[in-house]
């Protein structure tokens, strides 16, 4: 069954087992009761498509797509509709019902577009925080890579308050001092942690990163560049209307990083809907100006 499904829609291991077959076929509408725990703000399909179209206009033609917390997979579906040379897709998601729904949506996409070229699609039911990317990194060495998505908009301390298991391993990620450094309890946004891990993964690759993040997270990443010197050639921020797109009262944007060797320390801010440049902020003569 899995071999047939892969020929039909590109998904490797469509069914994990017999139980998975029945749960996918008879999957009900998904209503999550733990959205707060997972910082779960799902990207609507129109926004995901608009983001992919923006990237395509900039000449981005990925051969490999990675979505670190893919949720319902709207970015994966949008990428399949937008880019014509995708060879492999990796989607990682902790909430299995979302993956089951995504599998059916991808199947429907290829049933509706039978002439479309098939990508090899790996949908992995895993927690990002204990997922090892190294075994798959060799498969995309030297290829054009796009990391895309909308990682959770929640802090680790908030997850700790509600006793969540969806936490990264304790580490001095934010270079905290004193007791916080010892206990690993320094507060930070989960999305920032995910973004930094993806930047490290993409170092030395031909790659772009496009993530929806809170503006405070983007500012932290730009501010950290003076010390980290990640190999980023260009940093761009496209402001979105989070209230309109997500019903969320928070300042948020699309962060677009072009990987390279320059160690960019300034961010160009644009309006997402018009692509009109607004201003630039970052490091100037050793001072962070925002």
Question: Could you tell me what each predicted segment is?
Answer:
Residues 1-58, 108-135:
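S-adenosyl-L-methionine
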Residues 36-37, 41-50, 69-77, 86-89, ...:
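Signature of N6-adenine DNA methyltransferases within the class I
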Residues 58-61, 86, 113:
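Alpha-solenoid repeat scaffolds
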Residues 62-69:
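Conserved class I S-adenosyl-L-methionine
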Residues 80:
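Gly/Ala-rich phosphate-binding loop of Rossmann-like dinucleotide-binding domains
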Residues 83:
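Conserved phosphotransfer cores of two-component systems
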